[in-house]
Amino acid sequence: MGASTFSQSFAEGYAAWALMLPALVGCALLIYRAFFAIRYPANLPLAGEPDGKRTFSWRTRWRYYIDCEALYKETYDNYTKHGKTVLLPGLGFRHDIVLPQSAMRDIMARPEKELSHADAVLELVQLKYSLGHEKYKADPWPCMLVKSDINSKLEAVCDGMNEELKYAFDKYVGCDTESWKEVDLLETIRMIIMAAASRFTVGFPLCRSEAYLRACWKVNDGIMMNGGLTGATPRLLRPIVGPLVTMKLRQSIEQVKKHVEPIYRQRVQALSQQNSAEKPASDETQDLFQQMLRYAQRERPGELHDLPSMCRRLCFANFAAVHQTTLLVTNMVLNIVSSDPQHNTISVLRDEVKDVIGPDSNAKWTKYKVAQMIKSDSVARETMRLYSNTNRGVFRKVLVEGIKTEDGIELPKGAYVSFLGRPLQCDPETFEDPFEYNPFRFSRIREQAPRDTKGRSSASHLSFVSTSPEHLPFGHGGHSCPGRFLVDFEVKMIVAYLLMNYDVEFPAEYKGQRPANRWMAEALMPPSGARIRIKRRS
């Protein structure tokens, strides 16, 4: 076939496709509206639209992507604050019903068969495509192990993590006491936290394999990308888009599997020689992966001998362990450095570490000591208040008809409901100077609050790990983050080690001001490429 004939055929084919495409899209929309679209009640108002409007304008939909902070604040001021239910535009074709905080008790009291937390998270993360099956959230037994087993052994777990932090700081930050070094903060924190978390999840020596740590981060990044791209796609097209989006992710999971396989084979063989009811040997490793294998031996024997399944469960555990923690610690460091001139933040935190933990970097961290670090705690909670990555919480999917809100809105089956977080955390009626980062905002309140006969502060509900309907970074209720107590240890250990062993400052061109965070739709992300200067203390 000659070039001209090929060009003519291509042009004719392209013209035919151009004529067919609008018809195909139109048919897809008709099918979607007829069989898949959720029919919202007529009395449910739409955020950003006039009363009585039944569909979102393109302008309001676009605001979700370019001005979500203002859209959420407007929704809070006009609806949530007045006890009203409202519909918000979401990612892609998604809509979200936002409920007032007064409805939270009733929502959380509903059983999973009526309002499903698992189904809501599956919609957000799209695990069907990222990990190949929805069971990793629908049956999240590793999370149960964190809540029941690991939290009871926090001090022992954190001994290993603290040791790993020292190694990771030496490796990724350095030990030079003479020269300042400029580092990409987010990238450095990513590697340090993945190393520490891997000491908890897979133990030594795999936690020190940089190739393994980077493969884990590729998996995490792939999970996030899939949640955004596939989640934004109409349901009809997800079986096509999902596998395409996750091609590189599947390769990264295979890389993780290759690293994990030797310890998996070794440990499964050792377990096969024991009775599942036997207590672990005193010298048996106690990392999460070992706990997972022991649990699978007792309760999920089909998964025990399924390496791909166990590897994917480990990948999801890694994702839960490091994603939010990395963003939190990055923001904490930026906030500590930027607030130092006004609040003497670095010296105050160093003094607290000396007083509570002691000057020895090998001192043991205990629950009691961590609870006494109320200034570090305040720095963390204030960071979550202003810079939480997630700005809604308590997500549920409606599975039954007939559930009505207190303001008379019937929640349609298949709809997703949630509660706003950030607008409440920045409400000037609750917080003085709500958009100013005040590192010791919460510690001052706790220090001045009355105490009971056992010395407990009446303001202990303002601790970093405490949740409430007005403070949702960790969720609230029965599905609040089970790993937040481990995160409490981890972030305080990281900040303590950083400040006790390094001097930190911003590059001169920052003029003492932290770079601004950036909004990506409703997610608030640390500034990309933010740098700090760092030098080991003598």
Curated annotation (Swiss-Prot):
- EC number from the UniProt entry: 1.-.-.-
Pathway it works in:
Secondary metabolite biosynthesis; terpenoid biosynthesis
Which of the seven top EC classes does this enzyme belong to? oxidoreductase
Subcellular location(s): the record lists: Membrane
Which UniProt key words apply to this protein?
Answer: Heme, Iron, Membrane, Metal-binding, Monooxygenase, Oxidoreductase, Transmembrane, Transmembrane helix
Transmembrane region positions? 18-38
What are this entry's molecular-function GO terms? heme binding; iron ion binding; monooxygenase activity; oxidoreductase activity, acting on paired donors, with incorporation or reduction of molecular oxygen
Q: Does the record bear Heme in its keywords? A: yes
Q: Which CDD domains match?
A: CYP503A1-like
* Similarity annotation: Belongs to the cytochrome P450 family.
Instruction: Please describe what this protein does.
Output: Cytochrome P450 monooxygenase; part of the gene cluster that mediates the biosynthesis of the sesquiterpenoid aspterric acid (AA), an inhibitor of dihydroxy-acid dehydratase (DHAD) effective as an herbicide. AstC catalyzes the third and last step within the pathway and converts the alpha-epoxy carboxylate intermediate produced by the cytochrome P450 monooxygenase astC from (-)daucane into the tricyclic aspterric acid.
Q: What is this protein called?
A: Cytochrome P450 monooxygenase astC
Q: What is the source species?
A: Aspergillus terreus (strain NIH 2624 / FGSC A1156)
What gene does the UniProt entry assign to this protein?
A: astC
